[in-house]
């Protein structure tokens, strides 16, 4: 999604810190390899990422950086400094968060001066059980300017003719039944 949203940049590089959940990194490698996106792992000598670790990427063409908060080692990242560093270089920030941690930690939308560009996570920590062995539910959110690049169907809240609240699929021009060749909804199951 970050590469699609960042079309003006020719970069296909996404930085991923080695303290991001290894399972998430494996899925990202599988998904990215078929799309020509290069995931580059940032080594983790101290268990957390610092702006000093990112200095070698100054001036390089990078599309996005993935930050997990808290990281896989249970450490808290300096999300404000990393987010501001990335945005100063026109690099999108992708936040992977545990939703239960957001009760005490700053939400991705408040990281740094502008907040993360994309936030995602697993709903299992909220007590969502497996159903016949899977799948878990997840969440994905982004800034309004990137909504059209989101995979999957988007449901919006509306009011019907009788004034009752209802829900409907929105932005359907991006759906596979409308624009098959440019659809973003055909890569997910929409279960949940």
Q: Which residues make up each language-model segment?
A:
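Conserved beta-loop-alpha segment that forms the PLP phosphate-binding cup at the N-terminus of a helix
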Residues: 1-10, 138
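Short acidic (Asp/Glu) and glycine-rich catalytic loops that position anionic groups and cofactors
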Residues: 7-10, 35, 62, 117-121, ...
């Amino acid at each position: 999604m970050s590469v699609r949203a960042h079309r003006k940049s020719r970069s296909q590089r996404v930085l991923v810190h080695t303290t991001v959940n290894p399972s998430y990194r494996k899925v990202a490698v599988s998904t990215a390899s078929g799309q020509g996106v290069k995931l580059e792992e940032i080594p983790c000598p101290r268990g957390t990422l610092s702006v000093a670790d990112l200095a070698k990427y100054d001036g390089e063409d990078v599309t996005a950086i993935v930050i997990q908060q808290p990281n896989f080692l249970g450490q808290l990242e300096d999300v404000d400094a990393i987010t501001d560093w990335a945005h100063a270089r026109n690099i999108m920030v992708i936040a992977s968060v545990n939703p239960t941690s957001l009760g005490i930690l700053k939400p991705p939308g408040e990281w740094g001066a502008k907040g993360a560009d994309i936030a995602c996570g697993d709903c299992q920590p909220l007590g969502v059980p497996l159903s016949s062995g899977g799948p878990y539910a997840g969440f994905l959110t982004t800034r309004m300017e990137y909504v059209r690049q989101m995979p999957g169907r988007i449901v919006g809240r509306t009011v019907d003719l009788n004034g009752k609240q209802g829900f409907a699929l929105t932005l359907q021009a991006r759906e596979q039944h409308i624009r098959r060749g440019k659809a973003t909804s055909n890569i997910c199951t929409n279960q949940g």
